[in-house]
């Protein structure tokens, strides 16, 4: 092997060893997004929910601003239960599901997959039945979420 190739290979191996401390990406967010589209019939993008109220998106605290934000609070709590009761990692748990009309249906094998899929399905259905109020998107969470 050419010395330059060996040096590159060594650099890649060292980089990969260092990358083992990097937390995994939230792989199931894409699945959750498709589930949201299933439940709402594609009427609203899943991205519309990322910075909504006090709970939709990263983190969450305070009192939910409306029913839709409450859906996100319940979803956060459901993920917390998956971690606490079953030792699941909800953000990286992939599962199998199908869309029947506007109803997501979980079809999974393990307890973690089933629990996380049900968290997502219930949240997606809750999003679909709760009004979206633009005034609650991208709010000042420091001021409103106490």
Swiss-Prot record:
Q: Tell me what happens on changing residue 58 to L.
A: Almost no decrease in neurotoxicity, myotoxicity, nor in catalytic activity, no change in binding affinity to M-type receptors, no important decrease in binding affinity to N-type receptors
Tell me the active site.
Answer: 75, 120
Supply the CDD domains for this chain: PLA2c
The impact of changing residue 75 to Q is: 16-fold decrease in neurotoxicity, 500-fold decrease in catalytic activity, no change in binding affinity to M-type receptors, 50-fold decrease in binding affinity to N-type receptors
Query: Biological process GO terms, please?
Result: arachidonate secretion; lipid catabolic process; phospholipid metabolic process
Q: Which cysteines are joined by disulfide bonds?
A: 38-99, 54-145, 56-72, 71-126, 78-119, 88-112, 106-117
Q: Where does the secretion signal sit in this chain? A: 1-27
Q: Subunit comment for this entry? A: Monomer.
Tissue localization of expression is: Expressed by the venom gland.
Biological source species: Oxyuranus scutellatus scutellatus (Australian taipan)
Reactions accelerated catalytically: a 1,2-diacyl-sn-glycero-3-phosphocholine + H2O = a 1-acyl-sn-glycero-3-phosphocholine + a fatty acid + H(+)
Keywords associated with the record = Calcium, Disulfide bond, Hydrolase, Lipid degradation, Lipid metabolism, Metal-binding, Myotoxin, Neurotoxin, Presynaptic neurotoxin, Secreted, Signal, Toxin
Q: Which family does it belong to?
A: Belongs to the phospholipase A2 family. Group I subfamily. D49 sub-subfamily.
List the SUPFAM superfamilies. Phospholipase A2, PLA2
Q: What's the protein called, per UniProt?
A: Phospholipase A2 OS2
Q: How is the cofactor bound?
A: Binds 1 Ca(2+) ion.
Q: What's in the GO CC field?
A: extracellular region
Query: InterPro entries per the record?
Result: PLipase_A2, PLipase_A2_Asp_AS, PLipase_A2_dom, PLipase_A2_dom_sf, PLipase_A2_His_AS
Major localization listed first in the record, in broad terms = secreted
One GO molecular function term?
Answer: toxin activity
Stored Pfam families: Phospholip_A2_1
User: Which EC class does it fall in?
Assistant: hydrolase
Top-level taxon in the UniProt lineage: Eukaryota
- Main role? Snake venom phospholipase A2 (PLA2) that shows high presynaptic neurotoxicity in vertebrata that is independent of catalytic activity, as well as local myotoxicity when intramuscularly injected into mice. Blocks acetylcholine release in Aplysia neurons, and potentiates pro-inflammatory cellular signaling. Potentiates glutamate excitoxicity when coinjected into brain of rats. May act by binding in a calcium-dependent fashion and with high affinity to a neuronal-type (N-type) PLA2 receptor, and with very high affinity to a muscle-type (M-type) PLA2 receptor.
Tell me the residue numbers annotated for binding Ca(2+): 55, 57, 59, 76
Query: What does UniProt list as this organism's lineage?
Result: Eukaryota, Metazoa, Chordata, Craniata, Vertebrata
